[in-house]
UniProtKB/Swiss-Prot annotation:
GO terms for cellular component: photosystem I reaction center; plasma membrane-derived thylakoid membrane. SUPFAM superfamilies: Subunit III of photosystem I reaction centre, PsaF. It comes from Trichormus variabilis (strain ATCC 29413 / PCC 7937) (Anabaena variabilis). It comes from the Bacteria. This is Photosystem I reaction center subunit III. PANTHER family: PHOTOSYSTEM I REACTION CENTER SUBUNIT III, CHLOROPLASTIC. It is a multi-pass membrane protein. Belongs to the PsaF family. The chain crosses the membrane at residues 83-103, 124-144. Keywords: Membrane, Photosynthesis, Photosystem I, Signal, Thylakoid, Transmembrane, Transmembrane helix. The keyword Transmembrane helix applies.
Amino acid sequence: MRRLFALILVICLSFSFAPPAKALGADLTPCAENPAFQALAKNARNTTADPQSGQKRFERYSQALCGPEGYPHLIVDGRLDRAGDFLIPSILFLYIAGWIGWVGRAYLQAIKKDSDTEQKEIQLDLGLALPIIATGFAWPAAAVKELLSGELTAKDSEITVSPR
């Protein structure tokens, strides 16, 4: 049985091979020079009330890199010349997600002291939540402060370990 399994494994591994990998962006060209992109730009539809919105959109896209199909591709390799494409929006996303998480955590800690905690989790107490939301923009500094003071992490004695 072991030999049969080994034989099947050898056959499967010998027939399963990965195609050669291409370098990131090797087949990408500037959209302004891409014929497929130019064909798409000629048929650009307006997406707003502005009659030139389609043309303006494709003018902005012409600064990007396009594949052979004519569509712009997002390069996410860490080069700073493309930071505006991905790096800045991703940092902004992480900041906003952290703000939401920090404010939610602070709200749950604030209502924990009340008697109707479950009700305040379902129906937000806006009188309590709005000041917390307003101060949430400084969450990175508050997180560092709580991390250094030990408030952010639980003590080892508070963490239960189940016996096995």
